[in-house]
Amino acid sequence: MTPSSPPPPAFYYLTNFERALAWLGERYDDVFDDRERAFLQAFPSLPQASRALLVRMLMRNGPDFRASKLAYDEIGCPLAAAAPLVAAGWVDPAPVLTLDEIFALCTKAELLRMFAALGAHAGERKSEWLDRLRLEHDMAQPFDVWFSGAGQPGAGQPEAGHPGAGRDDHVLRVTVGALCDRLRLMFFGNLHQDWSEFVLADLGVFQYESVPFAPSSRAFQRRGDVDAYLALHACRDALDAWPDDAPLEALVDAIGTVACGQPWLETRRAKLLFAVGQAGERRGAWPLALDAYARSAWPGSRHRRIRVLERSGRDDDALALALDARAAFESDEERQRVERMLPRLQRRAGRAVERAAAAPDVPRDTLVLARPDTFVSVEYAVRDHLAQPGAPVHYVENTLINSLFGLLCWEPVFAAVPGAFFHPFQRGPADLHAPDFAARRADAFAACFAQLDSGAYRETIRRHYATKLGLQSPFVFWGVLSPELLDEALACLPPAHLRLWFARLLADIRSNRSGLPDLVRFWPAERRYELIEVKGPGDRLQDNQTRWLGYCIGHGMPVRVVDVEWAGDVVVPAAAAGHCA
């Protein structure tokens, strides 16, 4: 929300939640079980304060909440609001709490009074108390019993008048958390977003493309798809909590047994197996890492297998796999990594070392500039220095090529492919970085690329610029793409070059949407351009920048690197500086 935006309505979060429930109810009734269906039917009939309280608790870390911490002006008394939730069976008004749970709910001062008779003292941290008390205190009891000291001879009593202390406070436990997490997953398509991130579209802060949701485009086609996602998510959580000294083979097997009936779920499995492989590498568990990577189709898995084979001393196997990769690289990133490894692998395997193909010679000039009196980025300094009447220079970095691609290919990017769109407030498809993103939309992308041959691309880009202006997009940078920049780009960038850029971008969106040169200079009268990568003193080209520069040079595109030095810092031959006019 911008500073000038009005504050949201008092119950904005409840409106969001109810919209999500209505959205799900219209599209997934056949996927719900009886309990979920009953929840969706009963929720609207509860008093507004009760509905709001439940959503507030779902938006916070739970499932246990002290009533004194649920103070919301629009809700009023939390206990009164909770009564209908208790009657519905969605909230437990007197949960039995373990030692760990009571520690999570209470302050250090409260715990000190509660466990004074057991030797707790102020000099210890809460975590130290908890570790020690676990060894001698395994009971579970309601909150008021913990606070009264029952069962703890000599335990301290709460101070009189202490707000929310002891029996004056209550704990409420949400018992429909798992059910609502399942609904949250079905709406957002993931479990890292929560209801607090759900922004009302009609606040005008963000606007989204309208994506048609046909039954065939649903991400979850059957209940088992939701179960599969949750099973993979549980495996991911297990990996994060897995003890360092425990073998990971059982987790790999568990991931393999999940029944993934959708391609996008298989992609999630592949990504998870890749993460397990990385964990195996960190532990030096080479066989486990190899197995996980071999089962994974996630980009980079083959390169990691080569690394593991090398690190485990299997030099011949590492070389053989690297040569297989060289025969058909999966991406430019893999090509760059494997070509760096091959000479070393050949030496280690006792083979003749093949000379790597020479990298394209990228034109490189040095420009000496007076150091600005106030801070100006080196890219802007070069832009201002090079700009001339009839030859404007723009700082665009990754924004221009991405934006032109996004405008030309708007329809395939926002195609309602299963697993791509879950709700009406998405910036882009959820599978944007999946290895099969382009393949699942191949015909639509081919139709867009064909416009580069027919000349229709200019009209399509201009039409989308006019009709989609301001809509969220993973590619289009509306704040950078001015009408003037768009006109100059369409006049000066050849469609053959656009096709090459777009094809490379689409081949590996995760890696190739960044690394493009900083500046573009146009000569509109001559309908030509050049791309310029700017490097300040001490800056080096990054791998993705090197790949883009090599690609452009290899296809005959006008591109160069300009190294900037500040006058007075170093002495640069005049001839070297003279190329930047």
PLM regions with names:
Residues 510-515:
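A short catalytic or substrate-binding loop motif that flags glycine-/basic-rich loops and adjacent residues
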